[in-house]
Structure formats: structure tokens, C-alpha cells
């Protein structure tokens, strides 16, 4: 699930990425244009959900995917849109 919150003080949009319990055994990273496809780790919470929040420039569109346990790619069901990537799969889109 994606949640967005405009931070007018810092002129950014804070985007929270959430995945449900059972998504991964070891790790989840959100990998996208906003982190040069390097990956930002999601933290496993006490309730088993995975979460991280990143600050993004407003008025932009970013492609991303989730990398689960270092080997499995997932798209975001609540993404703003999807675009086909060079590997024939969909990347998720978040618009700020």
C-alpha cells in the first residue's frame, strides 16, 4: 500500500511503502528511480508488516518495484499506474 503526505515545510512528499505480513522471509527493498535503483530497505514491524518512508520531490513520477528476499520482484497493487520495463514486466508508478 502507498500512502502520501505533503510536507510543506520541507517541500517534499513523504511516501510510505507498506507490504503485508508474509510477503518475505528475510528482506524487502523498494528499488526505483528515486534511489537510483539501489534499493531502500523496508523494516519488518512487530505486526509482521514491512514499511519504509522516503521523501520525494513533488510534481514528479517515479518508477519502482519491490525486491523480496533478494530474488523475487513484486509490483505495488495500489500504484498510481504501471509501465512495461525493458525485461517485459511491469514497474509500478508513484506520482507526487
Predicted regions: what is each one?
Residues 1-13:
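Extracellular ectodomain segments of secreted/surface proteins
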Residues 12-59, 69-96:
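Aromatic-rich carbohydrate-binding modules that target alpha-glucans
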